[in-house]
Amino acid sequence: MAVTGWLESLRTAQKTALLQDGRRKVHYLFPDGKEMAEEYDEKTSELLVRKWRVKSALGAMGQWQLEVGDPAPLGAGNLGPELIKESNANPIFMRKDTKMSFQWRIRNLPYPKDVYSVSVDQKERCIIVRTTNKKYYKKFSIPDLDRHQLPLDDALLSFAHANCTLIISYQKPKEVVVAESELQKELKKVKTAHSNDGDCKTQ
């Protein structure tokens, strides 16, 4: 079963954990050299950040690619090339999950709710956001469903609009909820350092 396959790869990955500023930071190193870093709220175990880093063909470490979490604010000192040109007025896309849903927020979208259309494209395995006034178009996948090899279902998709922000929710299939719960049990077994015990690779 695919869900077990992904969970198994997390179980067998080399893991280090650090408790810092109310967050549990976990660094995974996979046998193929890929790295994943996650940050969880210490009290709720809610996922706050997930990012990936892959080695280049020449063996050099690439940049961290954010999958879940708030993009680094402008002027944060660690700007990626894609953030340098970003204006405060441009739509800002980010993913912030809840316990039961994958959730994305697109800030700086001032149009009323009835202008937006959010749908699943089964063929391309992605979600498409478009506006009737043709001012905005966005296509994005749900890597978690790809990793678990689960289908996308229109019935699990919903969206809301408030304060110039479009909030898109996709209810997590039960297989994902179970796998995430199993992972939390697994992470409890990882020896966790505290921020004053030394550094962690996720820093």
From Swiss-Prot:
Database matches in Pfam families: DPCD
Disulfide partners: none
GO cellular component: extracellular region; nucleus
Protein name: Protein DPCD
GO BP annotations, alphabetical order: determination of left/right symmetry; epithelial cilium movement involved in extracellular fluid movement; establishment of localization in cell; flagellated sperm motility; lateral ventricle development; spermatogenesis; third ventricle development
Gene (UniProt): DPCD
PANTHER family: PROTEIN DPCD
Family: Belongs to the DPCD family.
Function: May play a role in the formation or function of ciliated cells.
Tissue and organ distribution: Highly expressed in the testis. Weakly expressed in pancreas, skeletal muscle and heart. Expression increases during ciliated cell differentiation.
